Amino acid sequence: MAKTATTDAIALLKADHRKVEGLFEQFESAKADSRKKALADQICLELTVHTKIEEDIFYPACNGKIEDDLWHEAYVEHDGAKVMIAEIEAGKPGDEFYDAKVKVLSEQIKHHVKEEEKRAEGMFAQAKAAGLDTEALGAKMAAEKKALVAKYKASGLPKPPTPSFTGTRLA
């Protein structure tokens, strides 16, 4: 993930968003299966780490400080992304639905990012307005992110304990 000069939580999360957007763009134009697989694996790693630090650190700090509907939707959107990530991880380029799964994940993430980054009413704007200590949160998130990247690179990504729409057992 991109390094930032600050430990601000929102800046860190936005940098993650930009990185993943770039990876999705590269996937869209990739031709070779080996390149598609490498990009999809990187997308899944980046999103899994990002989701984990949001759910473990940022979202709990936002609880009660932002609109409940926005907070709830963020968790549900993460659940959908986790299922799609597990599907992508279980497959390979050339498999039926593989490219479609990456495309749908990209669309889900674009929607999620839009909800978080909306100028006035998005999650990040509401968190700032509520006075969250984004520097302290960011420092904690950056440390957790570093540890998770090392862990997931060594042992693989965690799988959600649900069957997918194609019947793949994900746990």
Question: What spans do the regions from the language model cover?
Answer:
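Small-residue-biased structural context
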Residues: M1-A171
